[in-house]
Amino acid sequence: MSEKNAYAKSGVDVEAGYEVVERIKKHVARTERAGVMGVLGGFGGMFDLSKTGVKEPVLVSGTDGVGTKLMLAIKYDKHDTIGQDCVAMCVNDIIAAGAEPLYFLDYIATGKNNPVKLEEVVSGVAEGCVQAGVALIGGETAEMPGMYGEDDYDLAGFAVGVAEKSQIIDGSKVKEGDILLGLASSGIHSNGYSLVRRVFADYTGKELLPELEGKQLKDVLLEPTRIYVKAALPLIKEELVNGIGHITGGGFIENVPRMFADDLAAEIDEDKVPVLPIFKALEKYGDIKHEEMFEIFNMGVGLMLAVSPENVNRVKELLDEPVYEIGRIIKKADASVVIK
């Protein structure tokens, strides 16, 4: 018995792994950017930081996954957008620190290598990288029979960006009177899906719920997370924002206070929040308390900016999209987030 046959009998298909690598090369090539060194398949990804032109570089890193949204991708057998979610979760955190994301690495673990499915996943990763302007410089696909079911997989990512030291955004510049501007989310993004799956557990995904304006439920649930890099970078370069909040798990209540010091608070005008139809549907069909929705979901705002009043018009001018003035920074009395 050859070693290859012995390994195959244990559930690991080496040939399928090689096929995955060949299939994804064209997708990786789409993400090329200045600074990338080496070739796909090396032991380590390399990036020449001098190509960024940053004078005092500070590296900023982020890692994340997409949680149980993956279970819906598997349930509905749609795998070409979940990779974008993974990229978004990492690069949006990096941009919140005032850094430009540079490169990305992915990790896929599965019970059985399915080259077609894994190519779809990586195509989504590559699309996310293109949208974020980052290079996909490496990754790992691990076939782990016994750890995962044959149709199951997990996906995680790691991104690195660079900030000019003087432009780091850490909340220290946010002050009382700053205006809170919201940029729209594309949907649920990648958080709260354990609750989402419970609410819609008995649905096929093909339903046309009246709240969803003609879209099938599964398409709304799998709408990929928006990537904010290209919207936010010009604002950072011009030093127009004092704070940035990526609204992820924990919704407004947990993420907004991460933007500023402990002696400040955010006052949110609920009427100005562009609540998306899916959140109204979740509240209705899940019998979720209205105030709890803001503790779980982004409610239609995926990125929040704290901006000095005199810079608001310039920010709106640079952003080629609707911008929502949803609140302001106040002195903290009790709660860190006050929704009125």
Curated annotation (Swiss-Prot):
Catalyzed chemical reaction(s): 2-formamido-N(1)-(5-O-phospho-beta-D-ribosyl)acetamidine + ATP = 5-amino-1-(5-phospho-beta-D-ribosyl)imidazole + ADP + phosphate + H(+)
Q: Has UniProt tagged this entry with the keyword ATP-binding? A: yes
The record, for InterPro entries, names: PurM-like_C_dom, PurM-like_C_sf, PurM-like_N, PurM-like_N_sf, PurM_cligase
Which controlled-vocabulary keywords does the entry list?
A: ATP-binding, Cytoplasm, Ligase, Nucleotide-binding, Purine biosynthesis
Query: Where does this polypeptide localize?
Result: Cytoplasm
Q: What is its EC number?
A: 6.3.3.1
Q: In which pathway does it act?
A: Purine metabolism; IMP biosynthesis via de novo pathway; 5-amino-1-(5-phospho-D-ribosyl)imidazole from N(2)-formyl-N(1)-(5-phospho-D-ribosyl)glycinamide: step 2/2
Oxidoreductase: is it a keyword of this entry? no
Q: Name one Pfam family in it.
A: AIRS
Q: Which SUPFAM superfamilies match?
A: PurM C-terminal domain-like (SSF56042), PurM N-terminal domain-like (SSF55326)
- Superkingdom classification of source: Bacteria
* GO biological process: one example: adenine biosynthetic process
Q: Which CDD domains match?
A: PurM
Kindly report, in one word, the top-level EC class recorded for this enzyme: ligase
Q: Name one GO cellular component term.
A: cytosol
- Which molecular function GO terms apply here? ATP binding; phosphoribosylamine-glycine ligase activity; phosphoribosylformylglycinamidine cyclo-ligase activity
- Which positions form S-S bridges? none
Family per UniProt? Belongs to the AIR synthase family.
The name of this protein is Phosphoribosylformylglycinamidine cyclo-ligase
